[in-house]
């Protein structure tokens, strides 16, 4: 029983790698610093969905690879950021901000970890089966060749699949999908 917190942490790491659902989305704003290109990634960051300058009008920022970023903005060009890349735990803005501006990030964030103090989160409330089967899978090396391990693996994979599919259905419910020309909006 001493290892149960370890099994929980390992199960959380596993489903944080597998899922990208609305319950994991977080929106935060940050202020740029004049003449400084880097911003720290938010705590719990997994993956960016959208990054924009909150100007009037709002200006979406384009992601580029670090290599392209270095070719375009490797020097000291300053102005209003239009592009960004992610290196290690930082967002690099290009061109380098000439003044203080507000950016808004929509990103996937890890679920809050369960602890002795924080005993609930979205996953344990809405999909406790993911925790159960994930913890059983992580405990398997210690229970030594339990014949139910394949059952646990299948149940875990099915639970993850069900959550992702439900989120996909919910995300696009309410109206028909359609192609939209957004060129006049920017």
Where are these regions (language model features)?
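Glycine-enriched, solvent-exposed interface loops adjoining structured elements
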Residues: 1-186
């Amino acid at each position: 029983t001493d290892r149960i917190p370890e099994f929980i942490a390992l199960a959380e790491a596993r489903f944080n790698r597998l899922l990208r659902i609305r319950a994991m989305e977080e929106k935060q704003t940050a202020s740029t610093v004049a003449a400084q290109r880097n911003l720290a990634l938010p705590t719990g960051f997994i993956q960016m969905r959208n990054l924009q300058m909150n100007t009037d009008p709002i200006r979406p920022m384009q992601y580029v690879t670090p290599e392209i970023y270095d070719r375009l903005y490797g020097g000291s060009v300053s102005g209003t950021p239009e592009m960004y890349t992610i290196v290690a735990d930082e967002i690099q803005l290009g061109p380098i901000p000439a003044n203080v501006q507000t950016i808004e990030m929509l990103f996937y964030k890890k679920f809050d970890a369960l602890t002795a103090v924080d005993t609930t989160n979205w996953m344990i409330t809405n999909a406790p089966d993911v925790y159960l089967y994930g913890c059983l899978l992580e405990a398997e090396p210690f229970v030594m060749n339990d014949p139910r391990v394949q059952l646990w693996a299948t149940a875990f994979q099915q639970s993850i699949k069900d959550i992702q599919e439900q989120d996909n259905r919910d995300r696009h419910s309410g109206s028909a999908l359609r192609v939209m020309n957004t060129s006049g909006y920017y």
